[in-house]
Amino acid sequence: MTELLKISLPDGSVREMEAGATPADVAAAIGPGLAKAALAAKVDGEVRDLNRPFEGDAELALITSRDEEEALELARHDYAHVLAEAVQALWPGTQITFGPATDDGFYYDVKAPDSRDPFGMDDLPAIEEKMREIIKADKPLVREVWSREQLIEKWEAEGEVFKAEWAKELPEDEELTVYWSGEPGGEDSWLDMCRGPHLASTGKLDPQAFKLMRVAGAYWRGDQRNPQLTRIYGTGWLNKKQLNAHLHRLEEAAKRDHRKLGREMDLFHLQEEAHGSVFWHPQGYKIWRELEAYMRRKMDGAGYREIKTPQVMDARQWEQSGHWGKYRENMFVIPDEIPNTEDEGELVSKDADWMALKPMNCPAHVLVFKQGITSYRDLPIRLGEMGCCHRNEPHGALHGLMRVRQFTQDDAHIFCTEDQVVEEVRAFCKLADEVYRDFGFDYDVKLALRPEQRFGSEEDWDKAEQELRDAVAEAGMANDDYGWEELPGEGAFYAPKLEWHLTDAIGRTWQVGTIQGDRVLPERLDATYVGEDGGKHRPVMLHRAIFGSYERFIGILIEHFAGRLPVWLAPTQAVVATIVSDADGYAKEAVAKLEAAGIRVDGDLRNEKINFKVREHSLAKVPHLLVVGKREAEEGTVAVRTLGEKEQQVMSLDDAIAMLKDAATPPDLRDG
């Protein structure tokens, strides 16, 4: 008699099943409702297809739409496959590559047949219609294990150049899986190479819960030397209600787009002559300077000493630090040139002598620390820099202020003893909390743990990770109120890190602040201090930032506040606008008094209707408009219009100045 499999369920019960049984069989045995609702299964912690047989006794948790995170991941993966199937059905000869799920949808990279132009936006409606047809057909999604040779033969026979190339590089001993859409080998079946898992059939998707959004160029394997493909992006959800909510969020995000508002408010611009670098206009640079002054006050108060380090350093320094091997492709590298003695005036490169624009500030800060002899009594030493860095990001990855090539960090490094690490991290947690609260952000705290590729011993990593856990616990943040979570494999190559994820006004999250404890870089760059025993010891180096980069943080602020920045940050805090020319003299007097009080103010004395002026300054997001006419001039008053409010307040000029001074006071300088 065949021994039955013991399948343990989350409620503690155990189901006995015949050999060859699947999670779908367990769901059906429990009840028809669950059998219908089940989308996939978690078998011994691994997400699998519902119809994949158990391999022995197992722990089983069935995934339904209530398990939203896992359900969305599965659905989006399936939408990507349906997209590729639809494109090949509509345009035979299309070559497919790969298409993953993303944070809010999916994409697939494809190459159009030579007989037509690359796919464009005009093709999306037809693709969507074909996708709905495939979904409504409720085609089974069937997993099979193939050999490497089978895969290569299949893709070469069908002219799938990209898939064949990929298959040839797969390890011979790896279990290789394909998925059929439709009965395997059937007339209307479609095949793709994929690890899975997938839903049981295309009909498990909602045909009204996805939308194709855009197309973009992409290179095979992300290499510009390879053929160009078309990346088709879509968004996918579990139901139409979720899709509509997402599209509404996108509409709201478009209104808040920092690139659009940056133009309207005349803050900055970008252009092709300086890919990934920002041209700050006077209005935008006022925001920058306010943030910089704010951060300097916070860092001065927390015991940091500001330094300034070189933009360019010898490649040997980056080799020694380990960055050359890890970041070389993302560094701007230039030859260290000397005069050519044979042809005076021309420049040639010395062999193997290269310089690089710094992609980060850390090695330079170690070099500052190493100047002179440091005693344990001097520690901790906190070195801060508004450090300008450069990273050679691909053109396609650049995005306004959010992803740039030249950026400035509120960077700092703390050199301390082993015994000081937890207290320094705890103090940083407190400082970060103060800053984010000053800007009105809620946030989550995450711990990014060791990646597969890393420097340092396991003992060092164990210690560094535990120190961060202890510090967060002491700061009172290791709980659900702060969204505490550990992220395996997400740490830097030299250290684990704490991450701060801000939530903006429309619910999006932005990872900004970090702190990481590093024992690798001090070792590689031979940083030491003299201990109490008179011997040399390695300091622990804590890398930390709060804004992350000024460019990105300003972009986040613009979108979070939809351009309506807090008064203390607004480039122009008030405009005095006249109704009639008779009030010009009084308006100039008001502007002078406001400037004397430290308010950033302009006067608008143009011969234009007041409604025109109101609209113009509202578009520029000026927080307060002080309207003056003949009566106000005679009475020494102003009519104050606050951005976003319908009613205006009439008050004396002195009261208006007092109100604006209070509103314009940075949060860290307020009493109480």
Curated annotation (Swiss-Prot):
Keywords: Aminoacyl-tRNA synthetase, ATP-binding, Cytoplasm, Ligase, Metal-binding, Nucleotide-binding, Protein biosynthesis, RNA-binding, tRNA-binding, Zinc. Zn(2+) binds at C362, H413, H543. The keyword NADP does not apply. Signal peptide: none annotated. Its cofactor is Zn(2+). Gene3D superfamilies: 3.10.20.30, 3.30.54.20, Anticodon-binding domain (3.40.50.800), Bira Bifunctional Protein, Domain 2 (3.30.930.10), Threonyl-trna Synthetase, Chain A, domain 2 (3.30.980.10). GO terms for cellular component: cytosol. It catalyses: tRNA(Thr) + L-threonine + ATP = L-threonyl-tRNA(Thr) + AMP + diphosphate + H(+). Residues 257-566 are annotated as: Catalytic. It is found in: Cytoplasm. Belongs to the class-II aminoacyl-tRNA synthetase family. This is Threonine--tRNA ligase. It comes from Erythrobacter litoralis (strain HTCC2594). The gene is thrS.
